Amino acid sequence: MDAKNYESQAANIVQTAEATLSDNFKNIDNVALLNQRKVLNAFTNNRVSARHFAGTNGYGYDDVGRETLNCVFADVLDAESALVSPLIVSGTHALTLALFGILRPDDILLSVTGDVYDTLNDVISGNGNGSLKDFGIKFDKIELCDGKINLSEICKYLEITQPKLIYFQRSRGYSWRNALTIDDFGNAVNVIKKISPDSLIMVDNCYGEFTEECEPTVCGADIIAGSLIKNAGGGLAPTGGYIAGRKELVELAAKRLTTPSTGGEVGSYENGYRNFYQGIFLAPHTV
């Protein structure tokens, strides 16, 4: 067979594959378009302009770039409030700020998606390293069942114990399972809230942003956290992370990032915020 025939065969294979998957591609485009509309509305409603891209130094009081970026993320993620900062070095750091901000000695943290990331495991259960365990915070976990949230075991647990915080990991991480869908999460939260209405719901949202039409905040998450190096940064944010959710919980996390007296009121960034704004603007399509 000559080269032209090979080219023709290859072209036919590609065309057939694209035709077979056309509905899937259309669904992906629809999700991207819907999320892009959210981002555009957030930029418009917060009157984002070139002045928000400028860098600052010193304490960062009244840093309009930082404060407006927080508002944009809150709107895009359907949250009351958001903390977005280049000083958050990773997703694990963002999650750690939220955990240490919310939890107190003798509180119980329950993971309903089994083991957490290795880097977060030492945050929760490390010995002598300033972990949650060192501060008297208890940790329990319920393993997934065939890659799905084990609602029956969760119900049994909650009938006996009322944890302060219930933790979901949305992505598969390093395990061989599918990522949790928003429907999976929403169904689980509905069940949990009927049994333990006072338990707070936290979601590790890393790799989950813009993959569906809405975020976990719409389906009952009290607080979510993620990295700007992944989806939400659109491939342009050079560093950073975010925390979003109920205003009082986000502020508790902000007090761990800075100080209990200043919270989210401070934090400068000399290099400026253009890449962060441009990253979130492009993220729906990039993801």
What do these predicted regions represent?
Residues 3-24, 29-30, 38-45, 49-52, ...:
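Conserved PLP-enzyme active-site core in the AAT-like
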Residues 66:
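N-terminal pre-P-loop "Q-motif" helix
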Residues 70:
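Generic structural marker for isolated residues within well-ordered, non-membrane alpha-helices
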